[in-house]
């Protein structure tokens, strides 16, 4: 069978998300409410969990072919990929392969440098990661989000991707999604956070 592709040449995101998003808002609310009652958690958590899964799929399957590789890490990716733990989270942790940003450097290489040289290399890696996260990655996730909302017959401007203003390293994104569940106390915000960087070790 042929695999559907995005305009940039990468594989398309899972069409099941579009099927669900195409349902009437009331039906989606009922689905979130039913799941929340079964799992004993606020319906806003269920809604956010859907968008966490959507974001993981958009990063993994919706990226342009030939772009920098991503290492998915942390409890959110672990729970979604392998079901080893059960958790609700708003954060997705990823590491960008330094080699693919043109800043190849393993831990041993960095340890051999003097303090000044090491800081320069780490600053260069950080700058490359910032440029990728706030440039191509942000644009690609926004494109996938707009496509998903349009395909579902929803307002394509109802979702947006923006830089996280609270991240001093400027390597995190917030994916704001169109909320259909009831308003809560503001504790569960309708946004999924992508925390990224390129300094972390790629091996466990």
List the predicted regions and their residue ranges.
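Compositionally biased terminal segments of proteins
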Residues: 2-204
């Amino acid at each position: 069978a042929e695999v559907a592709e995005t305009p940039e040449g990468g594989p398309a995101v899972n069409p099941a998300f579009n099927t669900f998003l195409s349902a009437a808002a009331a039906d989606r609310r009922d689905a979130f409410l039913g799941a929340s009652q079964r799992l004993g958690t606020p319906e806003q958590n269920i809604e956010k969990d859907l968008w966490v899964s959507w974001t993981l799929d958009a990063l993994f399957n919706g990226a342009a072919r030939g772009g920098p590789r991503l290492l998915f890490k942390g409890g959110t990716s672990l729970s979604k990929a392998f079901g080893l733990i059960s958790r609700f989270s708003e954060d997705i942790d990823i590491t960008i392969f330094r080699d693919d940003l043109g800043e190849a450097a393993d831990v041993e290489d960095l340890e051999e440098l003097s303090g000044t040289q090491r800081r320069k290399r780490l600053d260069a890696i950080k700058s490359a990661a910032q440029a990728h996260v706030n440039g191509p990655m942000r644009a690609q996730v926004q494109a996938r989000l707009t496509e998903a909302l349009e395909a579902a017959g929803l307002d394509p401007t109802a979702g947006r991707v923006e830089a996280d203003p609270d991240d001093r390293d400027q390597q995190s994104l917030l994916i704001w999604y169109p909320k259909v569940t009831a308003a809560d106390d503001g504790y569960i915000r309708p946004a999924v956070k992508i925390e990224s960087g390129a300094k972390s070790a790629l091996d466990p």
